[in-house]
């Protein structure tokens, strides 16, 4: 039987509720806790960025990172990016520079490493960023 990724810390990842896209490598898309929305008022916040927003991950409590890419069909070469966002307002707090993809259009992957850095994969490139979205490697 397959273990549930939400019941134990995922080795290699930052110890948070959602350190990697889809909740883990097995893509179980499940987190611990409750939504507690039964008696709550529904509120939806949205924003338009004109980017291919792919996945949000959590590092520390209330510290969220959005990763994505720019699709390329004709025009400028594609690139990836990471934004540190405010989860209440969706305001961008920090943003990486354009991250090369190697001319390969793929939505990419994002994870919070156990050492605290953010790992972003785009096309044939892997980038390591600080929690302030600065490129380390």
How should these model regions be labeled?
Residues 77, 121-123, 130:
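Structural signature of WD-repeat beta-propellers
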Residues 93-94, 136-137:
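A structural motif specific to WD40 beta-propellers
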Residues 86-89, 130-134:
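Short loop/turn segments that connect beta-strands within beta-propeller blades
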Residues 80-83, 125-127:
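A short loop-to-beta-strand structural motif that recurs across blades of beta-propeller domains
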Residues 4-81, 101-108:
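Beta-strand-rich domains and repeat architectures in extracellular enzymes and scaffolds
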Residues 98-99, 125:
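A generic structural motif
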Residues 66, 119-121:
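Conserved beta-strand element within WD40/beta-propeller blades
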